[in-house]
Structure formats: structure tokens, C-alpha cells
């Protein structure tokens, strides 16, 4: 077995997806605790000890207790090496999340057991469906009062159209939460409160009929025996093949805040989740075992280190091996670059990467030449597909308090648009700068980051824009005519792509009827 194959087989690369406040960042903390990456977990809110969550490292995230950017963390667990991508839970940061889902091989879906399936989870699941990504489910917050577990699983099956196979089952909930029964191991794992910041040494009782169980949890023992007969009859058995096709999800119950059940999920991910998978390019599928290096950029993050005003491109390694000092071919630019300072991440902590294998995420220092979706190889002209840009749903005009800082404003906005935090449009017929986002909070983030990172005081104001579409046409004459007649509605985005800015949906529909040879696209491949 080649060294590369051994390394590929060790890797598990997954993202955590959920509705805001379902407990995703808390789970990330506890996962890192089990991976020995943290000595003591910090929880997101109520930080009496000043312990901020390790994965929420930007200033604004620390202030608000929400994850805004995608954090990347690598840690060992048993014999595997886990790459965990923590995605923004807040609904306004969906674009970053969508793109992150293109860089993983499986996902952990976190559900608030008191609320069930929520809107954001539905949308994220639609994105995972595009690639049939395998999903592991964690029903969180068992230390609170929850909905009926069978009802929760029925809802997941009905709303998300995926079969559920319970792996663990809760015994009680809220103040009466006693633990879980592990169906595959035939054992009860007892819950102990007040152990949220450390790893629990849980008591395990083998077998449901064990008299020790009655001594430990009293009348709950008879309840769980009766309940399990019903559950086994009413639910699906775990089937690895269906899981790998994205048709069935193993379901775990627990409490991330109480640090209970998280190790059960990790055990499942390491045992069942796929190793790094082949990746599609425009010309062929790239296999992870191939000798030559290849990878694609799915995210750019500016100013990860405020002291150095830097920008880092996050790259998923798809094949071969990254070695310090190696020469890479930047396909879009047709240039070779020597890379000696790629990074690996433990949230805000960065280390120089000596080697990286398929499934790993490395950071490349970016001086404005790397864009989201760029492919790097060892010479072959490949282009990985499926890293999309989405048309924004909300628009604002950005204005300066100090008109002399126009240059810094444009620079800041273009850099922020290149990292995918926001999209910027420069109308052909005016000096306005229009910013497009998927949610309102993004505008606040942009103004905040312009101030702290670029020393630019800007304000945003309402503008009559309903939507934007990228414009394409193979016939240059027809495109020129369209540009001439519709110039007042045309703009260039941060990458100088022609975009139609529609004041109303009626206007867009009329233009589409009037110019049938012009393509008005909702998404753009990076």
C-alpha cells in the first residue's frame, strides 16, 4: 500500500450544518476536546471565565456569540485524522456555508430537539443533495425538555426526505435525562450532569435486561425496555450502503452543552463516513490516490491575523501530496508558483504545513491573485467544478463619510468580495458602489470590517434593486447592442463579470423576454 493511500484512508473531512442556535459551535468545541485539541472547552455565551469558543475567532463573532466565517480544524481521533469545517450558523452567512459544503466528504447535521427541523437546515440539506453527501444526525439539547424522539425522526424523514436509523436512544430528558441506549452495542451509557467542560467517564451498563440498570435509573429501566421494542419495530436499521449514497442517516441523541453523546458521533464518523472521494473536473474525475498534487480554493479569508493584514485562501487537497517548497501550477493564471509557507489550522492557531494529503485543508497566502474556485495542480490544466457564486438577495449602496477615502473603500470592498463575504457591483453609468448580500447582517459585518481592517468609515443605505443576474451571450454583436441599450442597469462585479442589476422583478422578466439571446444567470461558477 502506498504512503499516500495510507494517509488518504486515515482522513475524514466533514462539516457541521444546522439552524442558528441549534448548538453547532458548542459541538465543535466538544469534538475538539475529544480530539485532545483543547484542554478545556469554551462555550459560546455566558462567558463568565472569559473563555471564548475556540472556533469563533473573529472579533465580531466573539462579541455576538455566533459563527460568521468558516473555521477549519484538524485533530486525531483513534486511528483517524479528522478535518472539521465549522460553518456559519447565522442565516445571513449562507453563501460561505454552501461553498464549504463543496469541500467536505460528509456532514454532521445538528438539530435542536426542542424545535425539530428548522428552515436553515432544510436549505443546507438541499445543497448537500447536489452531491449526495452522507449525513450523520445529532439530536441536541437532551438536557432540556424536548419533543417526542419518534416524532423528531418522523419529521426528519418527511421534511428532509432521508431515512433515519437510530444508533442511540434517549432515556428521559430535561432534568430527568438519564442517558442513552446504544442499539448497536446493546449498552446503556449513563449521563452525569455538570461535566460540560471535561470528558465524562460515563458509567456503561451492558444489556437492557441487566438488573444493574434498575438499580441505576429506577422505573426508567422498564420504560426504555418497552420503548425499544416499539422503536426497533418502527425505524430503519442502519445500512452503510444507503448512508454512503446520502439516502439514510444514523441518528444520535445527546447534549453538546453537557458534553454527552459527542464521542458517540465521532466513533460513527470515523467508522462509517467516507474517506476522501474522487472529484469532478471539466475534463475528468481526479482520484485521491493519484501521485500528482491537485486542489481547489473554496474560501478566501481576509485579515485572519489583524497584525499582518493578510489574506489566506483555503484549499481542499484532492490528490497527491503537498510538500513544503513545492512548485504548483495556478491554472487560471497559467503561472507556476513556489509554495513554502502553506498553513494548517486549529481555528485561530495557524502552523506551517510540512505535508498535506487528500481531504486536508491548507491555507495559501494570497496577495490578491487567488480567487474562490481556482484550481492548483502540478502542471495539468484541470478545473474543478461545483464551487458556485449565488445571486445576492439584498442590496445596499455604500457611501463614505470621508470622500477622500474612495480608493481604500474600493480596495476593501473588492477584497471582501473576493473572500465571498459580500458581492460588490460597480454600475457602468455611475460612481455608486452597490453591495449585494444573502442577508442583512452581512452589511453590518462589511461596514464593521471596513472600519477595523481598512480604516474606512462607511455607511450603507437603501437602494431600489430587487435582484442581480450574471449576463452571458456568445454573439458579441447582440451583447454589444444589449450593453448599449441597457447600460443604466449594468454593472461589473468584483471579478469584472458583467451583471444585470434589476430594480424590480417585472423589469427583469421584461428584459429576459426582450433579449432572448442573452442568458441571465442566478449562479456563476467560480
Swiss-Prot record:
GTP binds at residues 18-25, 86-90, 140-143. Gene3D superfamilies: P-loop containing nucleotide triphosphate hydrolases, Peptide chain release factor 3, domain III. The keyword GTP-binding applies. GO terms for cellular component: cytosol. It is found in: Cytoplasm. SUPFAM superfamilies: EF-G C-terminal domain-like, P-loop containing nucleoside triphosphate hydrolases, Translation proteins. GO terms for molecular function: GTP binding; GTPase activity; guanosine tetraphosphate binding; translation release factor activity, codon nonspecific; translation release factor activity, codon specific. Disulfide bonds: none annotated. NCBIfam families: prfC (TIGR00503), PRK00741.1 (NF001964), small_GTP (TIGR00231). Increases the formation of ribosomal termination complexes and stimulates activities of RF-1 and RF-2. It binds guanine nucleotides and has strong preference for UGA stop codons. It may interact directly with the ribosome. The stimulation of RF-1 and RF-2 is significantly reduced by GTP and GDP, but not by GMP. This is Peptide chain release factor 3. It comes from Shewanella halifaxensis (strain HAW-EB4).
Amino acid at each position: 500500500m502506498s504512503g499516500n493511500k495510507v494517509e488518504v484512508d486515515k482522513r475524514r473531512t466533514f462539516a457541521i450544518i444546522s439552524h442558528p442556535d441549534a448548538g453547532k459551535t458548542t459541538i465543535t468545541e466538544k469534538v475538539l476536546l475529544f480530539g485532545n485539541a483543547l484542554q478545556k472547552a469554551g462555550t459560546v455565551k455566558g462567558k463568565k471565565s472569559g473563555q471564548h469558543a475556540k472556533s469563533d475567532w473573529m472579533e465580531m463573532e466573539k462579541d455576538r456569540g455566533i459563527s460568521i466565517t468558516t473555521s477549519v480544524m484538524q485533530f486525531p481521533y483513534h486511528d483517524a485524522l479528522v478535518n472539521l469545517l465549522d460553518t456559519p450558523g447565522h442565516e445571513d452567512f449562507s453563501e460561505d456555508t454552501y461553498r464549504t459544503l463543496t469541500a467536505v466528504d460528509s456532514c454532521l447535521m445538528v438539530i435542536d430537539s426542542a424545535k425539530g427541523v428548522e428552515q436553515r437546515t432544510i436549505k443546507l440539506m438541499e445543497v448537500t443533495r447536489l452531491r449526495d453527501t452522507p449525513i450523520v444526525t445529532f439530536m441536541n439539547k437532551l438536557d432540556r425538555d424536548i419533543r417526542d424522539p419518534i416524532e423528531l425522526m418522523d419529521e426528519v424523514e418527511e421534511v428532509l426526505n432521508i431515512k433515519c436509523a437510530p444508533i442511540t436512544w434517549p432515556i428521559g430528558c430535561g432534568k430527568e435525562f438519564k442517558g442513552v441506549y446504544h442499539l448497536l452495542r446493546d449498552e446503556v451509557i449513563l449521563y452525569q450532569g455538570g461535566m460540560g467542560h471535561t470528558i465524562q467517564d460515563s458509567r456503561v451498563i451492558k444489556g437492557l435486561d441487566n438488573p444493574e440498570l434498575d438499580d441505576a435509573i429506577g422505573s426508567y429501566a422498564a420504560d426504555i425496555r418497552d420503548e425499544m421494542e416499539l422503536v426497533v419495530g418502527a425505524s430503519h436499521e442502519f445500512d452503510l450502503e444507503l448512508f454512503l449514497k446520502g439516502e439514510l442517516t444514523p441518528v444520535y441523541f445527546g447534549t453538546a452543552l453537557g458534553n454527552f453523546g459527542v464521542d458517540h458521533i465521532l466513533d460513527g464518523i470515523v467508522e462509517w463516513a467516507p474517506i476522501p472521494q474522487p472529484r469532478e473536473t471539466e475534463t475528468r474525475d481526479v482520484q485521491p490516490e493519484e501521485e500528482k498534487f491537485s486542489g481547489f480554493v473554496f474560501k478566501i479569508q481576509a485579515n485572519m491575523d489583524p497584525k499582518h493584514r493578510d489574506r489566506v485562501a483555503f484549499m481542499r487537497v484532492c490528490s497527491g501530496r503537498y510538500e513544503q517548497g513545492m512548485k504548483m501550477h495556478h491554472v487560471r493564471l497559467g503561472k507556476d508558483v513556489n509554495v513554502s509557507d502553506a498553513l494548517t489550522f486549529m481555528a485561530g492557531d495557524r502552523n506551517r504545513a510540512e505535508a498535506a494529503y487528500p481531504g486536508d485543508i491548507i491555507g495559501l497566502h494570497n496577495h490578491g491573485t487567488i480567487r474562490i474556485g481556482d484550481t492548483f495542480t502540478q502542471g495539468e490544466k484541470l478545473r474543478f467544478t461545483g464551487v458556485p457564486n449565488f445571486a445576492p438577495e439584498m442590496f445596499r449602496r455604500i457611501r463614505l463619510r470621508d470622500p477622500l477615502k474612495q480608493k481604500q473603500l474600493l480596495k476593501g470592498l473588492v477584497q471582501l468580495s473576493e473572500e465571498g463575504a459580500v458581492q460588490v457591483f460597480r454600475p457602468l453609468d455611475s460612481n455608486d458602489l452597490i453591495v449585494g448580500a444573502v442577508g442583512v447582517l452581512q452589511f453590518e459585518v462589511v461596514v464593521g470590517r471596513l472600519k477595523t481592517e481598512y480604516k474606512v468609515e462607511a455607511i450603507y443605505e437603501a437602494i431600489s434593486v430587487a435582484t442581480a443576474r450574471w449576463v452571458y451571450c456568445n454573439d458579441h454583436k447582440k451583447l454589444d447592442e444589449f450593453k448599449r441599450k441597457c447600460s443604466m442597469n449594468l454593472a461589473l462585479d468584483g471579478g469584472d463579470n458583467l451583471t444585470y442589476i434589476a430594480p424590480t422583478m417585472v423589469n427583469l422578466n421584461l428584459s429576459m423576454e426582450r433579449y432572448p439571446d442573452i442568458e441571465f444567470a442566478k449562479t456563476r461558477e467560480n
